[in-house]
Amino acid sequence: MQYHLQVEPHRCAHRTFPSPMTDAVVASEYLDESAKWENFKLDPRLLQAVYQLGFEKPTLIQSNAIPLSLEDKRDIIAKASTGSGKTGAYSIPIIQNILSEGLSEHNIKSVILVPTKELANQVTKFIEKLLVYCNSITQINLATNVSDQVVVSLLSAKPEIIISTPSRLTTVLEKHASIVDLTTVTSLAIDEVDLMLSYGYMEDLQKLDDFLPIKRNLQTYLMSATVNDDVNDLKARFCTKPAIIKLNDNEENQNRLVQFYARTSEFDKFLFAYVIFKLHLIKGKTLAFVNNIDRGYRLKLFLEQFGVRCCILNSELPVNSRLHIVDEFNKNVYNLLIASDESTEVTEQEGEDDQEDSKPEKSKKKKGKKVDGEYGVSRGVDFRNVACVLNFDLPTTSRSYVHRVGRTARAGKAGMALSFVVPVKEVGKHKTATNPGAKRDEKVLARIVKSQSKNGFEIKPYQFDMTQVEGFRYRAEDAFRAVTSAAIREARIRELKNEIMNSEKLKRFFEENPQDLASLRHDKELHPAKVQSQLKRVPDYLLPESARQDPKKIGFVPFHKNKVHKNRKRKGGKKVDALKSFRQKK
């Protein structure tokens, strides 16, 4: 028998509170004001760590999931938006159960699976803070880039908690089955379940059947922002009589997120981006998504010619660099982050069009360079205080769109999403600016509008005032011509070399000198082949009248230079010889 629970968020004024989940904030409607942490009978050490993290009240998901898992020993399937406390809903009971069982000897007690290395790092950091007073419990993050020798050494110590991606864990188990014993595991948590399936981890999850005590002495947590039919396979495989908890917060998200789309030509994407960021039309931080790595560098090289600083996040960069970029973005070091969303999510629910359209893209991926298959930015990564999500390139599926725009309007804050859509008649007219996936933009937009309307969201068309924008076109064209394929290739090589050096050679130094880490920046100019410094200044005549400088405050500017100054420059005379003019005093 399954236990279903529908949870409604509070309809109250928005307040935000520190969250131990990610050191971010939790909106007040997600808090359960009637619950207290003491009601869960947590270990004093764990309770003290929770309070030290600044979380005074459990969230609705936590107040329902934690008692069911600790007292009733139920498997948990939870559906709730990002920022509602899902990470704490499974990590707190996992640690509590380990403490309750006692630690007479070290054994692997819990396995936490996440889809990306970035999310694995976030979960590791959070659990590390929960264990601040529980030094006897150890954890290991297998998703980091460490050698097999180091992994074997760490696993031989039998850490109580293992955090990993499914593929990394199965690889380690197959290579070192004699060292890693998972028969003692009592808790299994799978975070971002729907993304696990989209990333193709189903085969790896099936392999875990041979190593985990499935349905014998295993308590399972399946956590996701969306729960659909695809989750049924995992539910049947890992769960026994699960309690299903759903947080109905669509109305709250609808009030906070404003969505727009703008139909534009392929080159005008760059023109609009120049105007938006150079004139600071968006207040706050922006997360811009492109569909491949080259597009990200082309946009960065284009914008930096106008003095617009930004950094890039893609699968080519070392893991340590990616994690540092996310941390610095969350600390407001950068206001613009260009992220390459290279994942292609294709499911039966998207329909035949999605499957047909995505086949060529998949084949191209296989022929391309090897990239990190466990990289992901559109989902799961904790981007904080994002004011705007800019879909510079429209995603290939409506589900990918939902994941992208979910990076803003979080934790009770308002947000805006703007998507550039290329009409079919405009595709291919500007070869250099062409995005291969643009030919599907109209179809994808129709599916996005349809899926969003089902959930009560509206995507409004946005029309740029071209009379204000046209004046910037010739400058944009000049800058765009400087961004050649050779310039992009050189920029990728230069950036990769810099980041590898930062990631590998300086890793140990920064561990010993964390204060010096702040000096490491990722938004340095890469420079195209042709540098045009004059483009960094916007002439006054290009600005709207409201933004122009008042002529009365400029003062008098003569047409000719002052003649006095000219004459002074020409004057000079003969220099006095000090030896000839020297007179001895009598």
Curated annotation (Swiss-Prot):
Documented EC number(s): 3.6.4.13
Which SMART domains does the entry link to? Answer: DEXDc, HELICc
* Keyword Transferase appears in the UniProt entry: no
Q: Where is this motif: Q motif?
A: 35-63
Q: Which InterPro entries match?
A: DEAD/DEAH_box_helicase_dom, DEAD_box_RNA_helicase, Helicase_ATP-bd, Helicase_C-like, P-loop_NTPase, RNA_helicase_DEAD_Q_motif
Q: Which terms under GO biological process does the entry name? A: maturation of LSU-rRNA from tricistronic rRNA transcript (SSU-rRNA, 5.8S rRNA, LSU-rRNA)
Quote the subcellular location field of this record. Answer: Nucleus, Nucleolus
Return the protein name: ATP-dependent RNA helicase DBP9
In its UniProt entry, the species of origin is given as Meyerozyma guilliermondii (strain ATCC 6260 / CBS 566 / DSM 6381 / JCM 1539 / NBRC 10279 / NRRL Y-324)
Q: Which gene encodes it?
A: DBP9
